[in-house]
Amino acid sequence: MPEMTRRRLLTAAGAAAAATFAAEFLPANVRKALAAGPPRGSGSLQDVKHVVILMQENRSFDHYFGTLPGVRGFSDPTAITLSTGKSVFFQPDTQNPDGYLLPFHLDTLTTSAQSIPSTSHAYTVQHSAWNNGKMDNWLPAHLAADGKNGPFTMGYHNRDDIPFQFALAESFTILDNYHCSVLGPTWPNRLYHLSANIDPAGTSGGPIIANVDPVAYTWKTYPEALTDAGVSWQVYQEVDNFGCNLLEPFASFQNAPVKSALFQSGMRTFSPGQFEFDAAHDRLPTVSWLVPTSYQSEHPDYTPAAGADFVASKINAIAANPDVWAKTVFILNYDENDGLFDHVTPPTPPAGTPNEFIKSGTEIGRASCRERVLMSV
């Protein structure tokens, strides 16, 4: 047995203390479920009967979790060096006397920083910030696009600002190398989320690299594939879905009769609390997609706190029923980074890779700035 050194003892004690602290910010049913230990079962995917997927809006990994211990955040030893000779965190800024701007804390305890303005996440601006992988143009890109709000690109929150999000990350599983699908805005990323496609060849209504739907899309979606396979599914949304149900632009859903299974599963709206009721009473389908309301989406300038309330309500309902908790996987991710800085260079396809470029040669397949994702319950 390895010797229990003082350092290892302190590390273990610190981890235990952090877990205890984090649990205080989780809803009551989740705390109870965690205290009960892992559910009995085979420990394999055979135990999973329900998958619940929630895609929130517009936050980058560093913006939320740059200060989280144990992940590739601000202490990342592999952070790249810019052509200036400085770390990627020293973003060039010609308007700053120092010549650079470092990530800075958005203190929500003494300011209104829960409600920061949204910065541009248009395809062209995102690619300008990325600068062909040099990762050195965040300030010029956002000062040009956002004016006086441009520096918000470098702002971040810490544990005191977003305690619930930190509690999830420390109690479950967080992936620090997850990237969204397109270096651009909501629509292309949510289309990949629901269909793995934005029609790069332009044969079925695409290619989609902006938040527009000039024609109805005709390619096949994941929900339709589930229907063909005999797998039950449901989109849970309210009347206010913030335009985040990207089944709506598809011809198959637009033309579906109101009483049809396709419309009822993909387009109908529910009163607040319907998912919570179905989860607590073990009435969930095999796959559920949750769609946030506008103010609970976490899209700036909506608040992380309102998003925390939305997420907490969902996982608390799952944990209310031990049988449901034991057989449910909950996946939380974010569609894109808004215009918020992240230091990790996204993976990109080689030039000429099939289905990664639209007809004009504009690249569409590059992953966006790194997003936090996957809190698995």
Outline where the language-model segments fall.
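Hydrophobic alpha-helical segments, chiefly the membrane-spanning helices
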Residues: 373-377
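N-terminal pro-sequences and low-complexity stem/linker regions of secreted or lumenal proteins
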Residues: 2-372
